[in-house]
């Protein structure tokens, strides 16, 4: 909990100081390195900036899962930018990736607990199943969509134990000029 609080404060401070996602994550990494290096702790992070006038997403990814960008037609782009996790090595550069956005797109971010959830036979939920659920449910609003994913995940897992946090975040893109 302490590391999470420190990370939240660091992100809050650095997003005020820097616009570029790689600069934000670079500085968060350096600030937290001294606090968590050597004790085996680290964390993943995704930081993105959406420019609604240009219809662009600029992002950096520090060891987090692939981000899905779903389109209204059901196709999905996998937004990958696999930087190192935060807190392990100081002064590592992080990369910025840019991707165009369109009205009707949906960004889907999730924790590894979603794709690593297992059913009673120990099969993984996986990225493919999540992508299929995303593609087939683009017509749902964000609230109904996320509830549908969690309902499907619960049905898949049955009575198997949950071993990790499970979170999913979706953003519908509307109002691009």
Predicted regions: what they are:
Residues 11-177:
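Conserved subregion of the PPM/PP2C metallophosphatase catalytic domain
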Residues 1-5:
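Conserved long alpha-helical elements within nucleotide-processing catalytic cores of c-di-GMP signaling
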